[in-house]
Amino acid sequence: MSHSSLHPSIPWPRGHKAKVAAFVLLIVCLAALWKLGEPSDHLLQWLVLHLASLHLRLLFKRVCCLAEELCHIHPRYQGNYSRAVRACLGCPIRYGAVLLLSCYFYVSLPNTVDLPLTWMLAHLGLSEALNILLGLQSLTPAEISTICEQRNFNVAHGLAWSYYIGYLQLILPGLRARIHTYNQLHSNTLQGVGSHRLYILFPLDCGVLDDLSAADPNIRFLHELPRQSADRAGIKGRVYTNSVYELLEKGKPVGTCVLEYATPLQTLFAMSQDGRAGFSQEDRLEQAKLFCRTLEDILADAPESQKNCRLIVYQEPTEESDFSLSQEILKHLRQEEREEVTMGTAGTFVAPGSSTLHQEPELLISGMDQPLPLRTDIF
């Protein structure tokens, strides 16, 4: 499966298919050269010279980058020149080894092309200078995305961690106690499988409304949970609150839950609307998906938080679709109910005999897909 369990459009991290393709390309090229009957010494010389030229071109490029970094040596590297050199040139041992090996083969093997070393170096420098000036070797969007994902440079990564540490990690541990207090005050309004969880809505288009009833009139605000306060970043008694909503179906209440949007999606939407952020709608969609995936990974490593919340990820509907947000939420609630019933099938089925009618009623747990009725006269 190449996507997250939250939603089919959320991708998993990239794998190693590029290396697999490179290995296949290596085998194909070696087979082609072997079939052409290329002499091994001639093949080795050209291969070494080509590898050396690639590394030399890369070295020229990084030296040009070093010229820029030296202008920022104090604010970026605290005046440490060796850090600046390592940041631009990478490992000097690797370059030294490649250059020494290349010089050895250049001297020891016959020079069939009859070109002096100085001429070759000058042409390499010329070609790399043109590449830099014309921008011919810029990274593709896929390469940039891969680097950002691997090194956690994405906007989504910071937003997900900020959302978890600054909000979810604070409210989720005490959520059940607050729901219990709420039920005591409101005649057990929150009941059922989803009564002890926070349901977080993730519209992938980042369309977050301040009023859920405006998104769907079948979602009706009921009450606020008891508030939670904490001293946070110099703010004494900072208040955190959550809202209880009632879900309607055909005009009748069919469920209640603690519900809200993921607020960082508002930040992504605002960035895409502000030209100063340089954030396109495509960037917004990509970062929204990565935000969901990153938060899913964070919660997977925090079981106490994970069991107290559920993420509801969905695509905003088109004009032709009959999408209903309330039905999407109800689908998740009912799915959890079915999962609870399925988990209960591991229990033992107890069938009361004729002599047990005077005893206290016992819970009947079915081994079927649907729960059995509690009446026994129909068996």
From Swiss-Prot:
It holds the Pfam family STING_LBD. A motif (pLxIS motif) lies at residues 363-366. The record marks H358 as: Not phosphorylated. Phosphorylation by TBK1 leads to activation and production of IFN-beta. Following cyclic nucleotide (c-di-GMP or cGAMP)-binding, activation and translocation from the endoplasmic reticulum, STING1 is phosphorylated by TBK1 at Ser-366 in the pLxIS motif. The phosphorylated pLxIS motif constitutes an IRF3-binding motif, leading to recruitment of the transcription factor IRF3 to induce type-I interferons and other cytokines. In contrast, lacks phosphorylation site at position 358, leading to reduced production of type-I interferons and other cytokines. 3',3'-c-di-GMP binds at S162, Y167, R238, V239, Y240, T241, T263. In absence of cGAMP, the transmembrane and cytoplasmic regions interact to form an integrated, domain-swapped dimeric assembly. In absence of cyclic nucleotide (c-di-GMP or cGAMP), the protein is autoinhibited by an intramolecular interaction between the cyclic dinucleotide-binding domain (CBD) and the C-terminal tail (CTT). Following cGAMP-binding, the cyclic dinucleotide-binding domain (CBD) is closed, leading to a 180 degrees rotation of the CBD domain relative to the transmembrane domain. It is a multi-pass membrane protein. Homodimer; forms a homodimer in absence of cyclic nucleotide (c-di-GMP or cGAMP). Homotetramer; in presence of cyclic nucleotide (c-di-GMP or cGAMP), forms tetramers and higher-order oligomers through side-by-side packing. Interacts (when phosphorylated) with IRF3; following activation and phosphorylation on the pLxIS motif by TBK1, recruits IRF3. Interacts with TBK1; when homodimer, leading to subsequent production of IFN-beta. Interacts (via transmembrane domain) with TMEM203. CDD domains: STING_C_metazoan-like (cd22658). Gene3D superfamilies: 1.20.5.5200, Stimulator of interferon genes protein. One of its GO terms (molecular function) is signaling adaptor activity. Residues 340-379 are annotated as: C-terminal tail (CTT). Facilitator of innate immune signaling that acts as a sensor of cytosolic DNA from bacteria and viruses and promotes low production of type I interferon (IFN-alpha and IFN-beta). Compared to other mammals, STING1-dependent type I interferon induction is strongly reduced in bats, suggesting that the cGAS-STING pathway promotes a limited inflammatory response. Innate immune response is triggered in response to non-CpG double-stranded DNA from viruses and bacteria delivered to the cytoplasm. This is Stimulator of interferon genes protein. The chain crosses the membrane at residues 20-40, 87-107, 115-135. Residues 153-340 are annotated as: Cyclic dinucleotide-binding domain (CBD). It comes from Eidolon helvum (Straw-colored fruit bat). Keywords: Cell membrane, Cytoplasm, Cytoplasmic vesicle, Endoplasmic reticulum, Golgi apparatus, Immunity, Innate immunity, Ion channel, Ion transport, Lipoprotein, Membrane, Mitochondrion, Mitochondrion outer membrane, Nucleotide-binding, Palmitate, Phosphoprotein, Transmembrane, Transmembrane helix, Transport. The keyword NAD does not apply. InterPro entries: STING (IPR029158), STING_C_chordates (IPR047191), STING_C_sf (IPR038623), STING_LBD (IPR055432), STING_TM (IPR055434).
